[in-house]
C-alpha cells in the first residue's frame, strides 16, 4: 500500500517514523516451497515482488535487493520485465535468508536490519544491511474454506485447495453438479487466470440455465441389516 497513490503515504515509500530510506530487501517465498510450512509454489509472488522492486527503484532510487530461491517468471511479458529490472540495477541474490537481525557491528550498520544469506551462485555467506524488509508471503486457502467445502460437498487437496473434476478436461467443474470453481479457491492464481476461469465458470452456469431443468441422479441410501455388526 505504500507505493499506492491512494495509500496512507500518498505513494511515497517511508519508514515508520516518516523518514525516507535508501535500501530495501525483498525476501521471496516466505511460507512457500518449504516442507515446514507450505510445500507448493504460490506462483504470483515472484512477479508481485518484481513489480514492487521496480516501483521502489523508480520512485526513490533506493538500492533494492531481491533474495530468491528461483525466479519463476512464467507468463506473457514476465521474463522481459525481469530483464528490465536487471538493467535497472536491481540486485538479485539467490539463496534462502537465514536470519534478519538488528545486531549491528559497524557504525554504517547502525539503525539498519542485517539480512544474512548464502549466495548460492558464488558460494559465499553475505550480510546485507537494509533499512526496510519486505516479505513476499505465500498464499494459503481462506480460513472459512473448510466450511464452504462441507456445505457444497467439494473435494479438496492435501493443502486445502478445492479440487476440479479433471485438471485438463474439466478444469473449472467439480464432482458436485452445478458447482464450478474460479480464482484462488482452486489454488494460487494471478488476475488474468482468475478472469479466464471466471468466464469459463459463467459459461457452465449459463449452459445449465439454458436447459431449463437439472437432472438429479436418484440415488437413495439404505441399510442392509445382514452386513451390520
Placement of each model-derived feature along the sequence:
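Residues forming the flavin
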Residues: 1-229
